[in-house]
C-alpha cells in the first residue's frame, strides 16, 4: 500500500490499483480500477470449466449454474445462456427428481434466468413446483422454520442449516419479487429472521453451520467458513432485489446481522 496527498492505492489480484481520492470535503471517494478484459477472460474460463463438469439436479449444480446465470446477466454473453439452456434441457429430458428437497431447490435460481431470458413456460412450471413444495410440503418446525432436507427421508429432524438460506430463502425471495407475491416474500424474510436467531452468535457475530432444535445446540459448534459464506452472500442480496426493502421490518434484522457478521470477519 502506498500513500500520497490525495489518495492511497492498493494493488488488486488482477494487477490494477484501488484508489481512494479525497472528496470535496476531504472525505474518501472510492474508486476501483480494474482490467475488464482480464476479468471477463477469467469468467469465460470458469464458465467453460463448469459446463464440462458432470453435475446432476442437486445443490452443487444449482450453485454452479447460479454462477453461470449471473455471468450471463452481468456480461450479456448469449453463449453462456445457450450453454446453460442446453444443459438444463438435457437434465429435464433425463428426468427430474420425483421428490423435491431443500437442496434440490437450489436449481431454481438458474430457472429464473432461463424463464426471464427465453419466456419458455417449462422453466416457470418447474420453478413454481419447487416453490409449491417449499410452501406446502417442506418439513418445518417452530415458527415455520424450514428444516434442511437432503433426501426424501427425514434425515435431520428439526435442524436448520445456513445452506437453506441459499437453496430456499433466497430463491423464495427472488420468486416472490418476480411474481409480486407478498406472502412468499414474507415467508422468505421469516426464514432469514429465524436463521439469524438460531445460527448467528450474538457475541462474536459469526455463524454456526446448523442448529438442532431437538437437542437445543449447534452440534459441532464451529464457525464453518462456507456457512458464513451462505449467510453473507444471501443477506447481501436482499436489499438489492427487494423493492423498498426498508418497508419490511425483518429486513432491518438482515441488514444488522450482515453488518455484525462482516465486522466480525474483518478481525477474525
Give names to the regions the model predicted.
Residues 2, 6-268:
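Glycan-recognition and catalytic cores of secretory/periplasmic carbohydrate-active enzymes
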